Amino acid sequence: MLTLARQQQRQNIRWLLCLSVLMLLALLLSLCAGELWILPGDWFSPRGELFVWQIRLPRTLAVLLVGAALAISGAVMQALFENPLAEPGLLGVSNGAGVGLIAAVLLGQGQLPNWALGLCAIAGALIITLILLRFARRHLSTSRLLLAGVALGIICSALMTWAIYFSTSVDLRQLMYWMMGGFGGVDWRQSWLMLALIPVLLWICCQSRPMNILALGEISARQLGLPLWFWRNVLVAATGWMVGVSVALAGAIGFIGLVIPHILRLCGLTDHRVLLPGCALAGASALLLADIVARLALAAAELPIGVVTATLGAPVFIWLLLKAGR
């Protein structure tokens, strides 16, 4: 038994090392890639200082943090709601951020700066999170809380559709493209949003024990003495914050929060002590690679990264499910 535990521990360490190497390689490739390829030897030249340090580095850091946040959010929600289909957009938090953004554009008549739009997106996500916490205080079951989140997401989606359909504003039509996901407008001015993600990411990665208990199910968690109401509130709030900041940075991006935790579980990473940091590394790597594809796929334009993640991720996910079912 001890030998099996040691073998599993060594395998987990190998997985984390491999994912760390993959993330570093994806990060280096992201800094080099573009219409103008700049190898590491030229990073400190005048051209490299402009393209690498001022344009590509903030974008790469944003992609890395958003990918980690979305993947961890997916892992947390799948454990919290005991549902393998749970992901960051399921509770309506992403759509809530979109409603906040569109309301800011309408009320500000397109004159608000980017930082104000980001704050409005975070505010929209947090409002939906507060509504969910209100439901949680009524001690609803996990399944009913999940259904409440789905209903809120549908309402927010309907509000966005009505606002965009009846609007003649060019800004709102551009926001529809933005809601498909993209990092094209990210620079060092959005560094405050990146910094807002780091403390929550680190904190959640340290909460493996309650996450492991939650994954056993609601009844088992109560029997083991876990304060379920407290952890449900805290984790919903943390997820809402991460998703709100991610939407403010890059728009709505699917696939990462749903598929990355699944892939790691299929690879044998079920302990949240390994799964949470593994999701951060794998989510960052996957989104970095998707961003590189989005930049290089078209010569004079950039694909929405949400389209890239869905196009590349869905077939891989289906293949993994078929492989696991054999």
Swiss-Prot record:
Domain of life from the UniProt record: Bacteria
Transmembrane segments: 19-39, 61-81, 88-108, 112-132, 146-166, 184-204, 240-260, 274-294, 302-322
Keywords: Cell inner membrane, Cell membrane, Membrane, Transmembrane, Transmembrane helix, Transport
Topology within the bilayer: Multi-pass membrane protein
Entry's localization field: Cell inner membrane
Keyword Plastid: no
Claim: Transit peptide is one of the keywords in the record: no
Gene Ontology biological-process annotations: cobalamin transport
InterPro entries assigned: ABC_BtuC-like, ABC_transptr_BtuC, ABC_transptr_permease_BtuC
A GO molecular function held by the record: vitamin transmembrane transporter activity
Entry GO CC: plasma membrane
Record note on quaternary structure: The complex is composed of two ATP-binding proteins (BtuD), two transmembrane proteins (BtuC) and a solute-binding protein (BtuF).
Classification via HAMAP family: BtuC
Record family assignment: Belongs to the binding-protein-dependent transport system permease family. FecCD subfamily.
Family matches, as NCBIfam families: PRK03784.1 (NF003001)
Chain's role: Part of the ABC transporter complex BtuCDF involved in vitamin B12 import. Involved in the translocation of the substrate across the membrane.
Protein name (Swiss-Prot/TrEMBL): Vitamin B12 import system permease protein BtuC
Organism: Escherichia coli O127:H6 (strain E2348/69 / EPEC)
Primary gene name: btuC
